[in-house]
Amino acid sequence: LRVNPREKALGIMRDKARKMSLHPRLVAAPEWTKIPMASEKRASMVAYYSVLIPDARLPLMRARVVDQKLELVYGDDKFKDLPVALKGIYAIDMQANCVGIFWDEESDLRATQLEDMKAYLHSLAEL
């Protein structure tokens, strides 16, 4: 059996993410993200990469990315219209001590933006 190159690239990217304390996982896309459903009754599975900030007490925030800017679904107006200079990002959420990105891993199979993603998540936590 030959390994699918796409699957291999995803595996390598997820390993790289873990090594830099980004926590990758596949989750059912929350309704508020407006990620298209897989079928009428079934949510799509989407990549969710998050950072844990142990001592943080972050406000609840949910935002979709529209035209490379945050469109607030819930949360403080300070996050409204913030630019997102990353490829393939659907949405961002923040709660308690965690900030995460829902994104299309296919948009960056070479894992070129993991460092930037991590830095962006930390910058949101510091706002």
Where are these regions (language model features)?
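A common structural junction motif
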Residues: L121-E126
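Membrane-cytosol interface motif
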Residues: R14-A29
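Transmembrane-cytosolic junction motif
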Residues: L1-R18
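Structured extramembrane domains adjacent to transmembrane segments
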Residues: V27-Y120
